[in-house]
Amino acid sequence: EFLFARTMIGVFKNIEYMCNRTSSKTWGKEAWKKIVVCIVSDRRAKINPRTRAVLAGLGVYQDGIAKQQVNGKDVTAHIYEYTTQVGLELKGTQVSLKPRSATPVQLLFCLKEKNQKKINSHRWFFQAFGRVLDPNICVLIDAGTKPGKDSIYQLWKAFDLEPMCGGACGEIKVMLDHGKKLYNPLIAT
């Protein structure tokens, strides 16, 4: 849940950043309405119970409703949707909920019944949600990766400035505790 929360905190800050771009023709106060955060998780029985609790705290998951079968047919995935105004806070590795500022966040959570690996999760995202949401751009972020406060905006800007751009990537920096240094050159690169 710590890694998931770290990623979500970064995503929330990016949405706030875009909402604060009041002189932008695209973004601004209502920017949150143009952004949907899709979370895809493999295998219902495998998801960390504390991560489930964080998702429930955000309002995008309800424990106890998901079933393996409906009318004798196997269920492939469970989809939850919610627009939250709850935020997350990290104190060490402890995750806690906190009231957010005025910026809501639209969440879509897909909990797959079976473990079908990362590529299948990407397929779910593009084929299922992509068709419905019809996004201009998609940003894929693994749990544990914390985007900088304007990283998602910078990726969007690359696509906006160059409409023929098919893909872009950001820089990933190692997160170290204060006062720590990397002495292993293989890890430092």
UniProtKB/Swiss-Prot annotation:
Q: Which GO terms describe its cellular component?
A: cell septum; plasma membrane
Can you supply a Gene Ontology BP term from the record? Answer: cell wall organization
- Where in the cell? Cell membrane
Instruction: Decide whether keyword DNA-binding is in the record.
Output: no
Q: Is Cell membrane one of the keywords UniProt gives this record? A: yes
* Its EC number(s): 2.4.1.16
Entry keyword set: Cell membrane, Cell wall biogenesis/degradation, Glycosyltransferase, Membrane, Transferase, Transmembrane
Reaction equation(s) it catalyzes: [(1->4)-N-acetyl-beta-D-glucosaminyl](n) + UDP-N-acetyl-alpha-D-glucosamine = [(1->4)-N-acetyl-beta-D-glucosaminyl](n+1) + UDP + H(+)
Q: What's its membrane topology?
A: Multi-pass membrane protein
A GO MF annotation of the entry reads: chitin synthase activity
Enzyme class, one word?
transferase
Q: What does this protein do?
A: Polymerizes chitin, a structural polymer of the cell wall and septum, by transferring the sugar moiety of UDP-GlcNAc to the non-reducing end of the growing chitin polymer.
UniProt similarity note: Belongs to the chitin synthase family. Class I subfamily.
What is the protein's name according to its record?
Answer: Chitin synthase 1
Q: What species was this sequence derived from?
A: Rhinocladiella atrovirens
The gene behind this protein is: CHS1
